[in-house]
């Protein structure tokens, strides 16, 4: 297994829709193992193919819920359905409960409204189908990682005033162009 460089916002692969995985072989399983190692070292709760420079529809996740249940796996060619979310215009964002970050916008956290529930259907790295009905934080993780597969970063979904704040942070860090990455275990994501 190897730790992979995590691409930073501005890298073209992060801003383009990923393609379907068509070959389920040892190379795919090695990529998934490397993604787990990278995510764990970062540390993160999810990591999508585009974040490590692979424009394919797959992500890994690892999160322990309030009951101590570990949710860990790989989702290849996922489909995600979500429940409706309450618009920010009706209910203010909770900066503690709804704040999230992204390994491709390292060191930054902002509140973002997500759906409370999600249904994930995918196959694993061996091509075995599975389905997970997720609520709360796990639903948030799935939505965040699924967005990456469509070329959307959480920073793209932020509303005022957070959208302006994240753009300022991106400019201050000199991100936003191709060729920037960081390596978990070597680089500190907050500079």
Residue ranges and their predicted role:
Residues 1-143, 148-191:
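Active-site rim/adjacent substrate-binding subdomains
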């Amino acid at each position: 297994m190897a730790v992979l460089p995590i691409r930073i916002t501005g890298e073209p692969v992060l801003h383009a829709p990923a393609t379907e995985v068509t070959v389920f072989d040892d190379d795919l399983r090695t990529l998934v193992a490397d993604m787990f190692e990278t995510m764990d070292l970062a540390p993160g709760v999810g990591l999508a193919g585009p974040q490590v420079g692979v424009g394919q529809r797959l992500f890994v996740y690892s999160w322990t819920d309030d009951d101590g249940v570990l949710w860990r796996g790989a989702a290849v060619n996922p489909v995600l359905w979500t429940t409706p979310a309450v618009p920010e215009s009706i209910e203010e964002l909770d900066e503690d409960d709804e704040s999230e970050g992204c390994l491709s916008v390292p060191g930054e956290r902002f509140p973002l409204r997500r759906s409370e529930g999600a249904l994930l259907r995918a196959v694993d790295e061996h091509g075995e189908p599975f389905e997970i009905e997720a609520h709360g934080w796990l639903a948030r993780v799935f939505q965040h990682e699924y967005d990456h597969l469509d070329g959307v970063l959480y920073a793209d979904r932020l509303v005022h005033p957070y959208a302006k704040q994240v753009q300022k942070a991106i400019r201050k860090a000199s991100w936003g162009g191709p060729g920037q990455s960081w390596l978990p275990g070597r680089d500190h994501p907050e500079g």
